[in-house]
Amino acid sequence: MTSKIEQPRWASKDSAAGAASTPDEKIVLEFMDALTSNDAAKLIEYFAEDTMYQNMPLPPAYGRDAVEQTLAGLFTVMSIDAVETFHIGSSNGLVYTERVDVLRALPTGKSYNLSILGVFQLTEGKITGWRDYFDLREFEEAVDLPLRG
């Protein structure tokens, strides 16, 4: 997705670094674009039945229904307003992304550009695993929204 996200200092100056070079990378980039729909029912179509999703600071969700419920729950408290993938690569069935998501806390209206490392596993064109690594405390403090229990 092309957006107004300022390129982080860590990002490659080579725009091809964020372009897909394999079918799995293409699917992941399509999914990244779809995230801004903030629609769990639309997003779950990218997932296999036997899947998992985890924002690494938080508990995992196993199975398609649990992943959809987790996403739907997240979208009640935040929206994903933009996603910019600066680096993407893959090896041995894993796709890695370095990206910035613009997240807005719905209760406070505050937005924050969150740097995220995402790891995706795909089988037959469907996501079987998705793990995002980021600093949860940094996000919570920036938008005044505690997500941890």
From Swiss-Prot:
InterPro entries: LEH, NTF2-like_dom_sf. Pfam families: LEH. Changing residue 53 to F: 15% of wild-type catalytic efficiency. The active site is at residues 101, 132. Induction: By growth on monoterpenes. Monomer. This is Limonene-1,2-epoxide hydrolase. It comes from Rhodococcus erythropolis (Arthrobacter picolinophilus).
